[in-house]
Structure formats: C-alpha cells, structure tokens
C-alpha cells in the first residue's frame, strides 16, 4: 500500500512540476502550438549542467580525434566556440524577450 501512495505522490509531483514550468515559461503562441515550457526548462538545465561539468568531461566531445579535418588538425576550438556563441545568443535572446511575466516570441 505504501508503494501505491509513493507512486501517486511521485505522479502528483511530476504533474505539479510540469504545470509550474508552463506557468513560469508562459509564452504567447497560436492555440494549435505545442507548449514549450518543458523544452525551455530542459534547455536551461542542459546549459547549467554543461557549465558545471569539469573541463575534460565537457571538452572530450570536441577534443577527440574524430573531430579532425583532412589535414589532421583538431577542430575542437571551432566547435567549442560555436557552442559557447549559440548558448550566449540564446540566453541573450531569452532575456530580451522576457517581459510582463513571460516570454513573447514575435
């Protein structure tokens, strides 16, 4: 019986979190559009996780030998720069679009 209560409690907690995420990321979209609050929250969590990873864990994806050009040069710097730039751009756009308790995509 305790397991059933725990499962219901966990389900309620997940439902509450999803509703809260949708409230925090209230976005003006056409009625047929899908809610993107969970997607934004996932992106925010992923960005935060990447910042907290140690350098070698995050960098291994770009520093591996599989990311070389035809002359054998490692392309990690270019890939790393692109990742940082796109993250900064996304964060900047997110801050610029926030207003009136939500985000307005125009």
Swiss-Prot record:
Residues 81-92 have a biased composition (Low complexity). Residues 58-80 have a biased composition (Basic and acidic residues). Heart. Residues 48-106 are annotated as: Disordered. It comes from the Eukaryota. May be involved with the regulation of GNRH gene expression. It is not known if this protein is transcribed. This is Putative protein SH.
């Amino acid at each position: 019986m305790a397991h059933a209560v725990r499962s219901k409690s966990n389900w309620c907690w997940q439902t509450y979190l999803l509703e809260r995420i949708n409230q925090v990321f209230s976005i003006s979209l056409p009625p047929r559009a899908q809610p993107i609050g969970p997607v934004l929250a996932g992106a925010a969590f992923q960005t935060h996780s990447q910042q907290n990873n140690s350098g070698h864990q995050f960098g291994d994806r770009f520093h591996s030998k599989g990311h070389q050009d035809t002359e054998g040069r490692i392309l990690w710097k270019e890939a790393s720069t692109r990742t940082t730039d796109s993250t900064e751009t996304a964060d900047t756009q997110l801050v610029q679009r926030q207003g009136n308790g939500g985000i307005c995509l125009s």
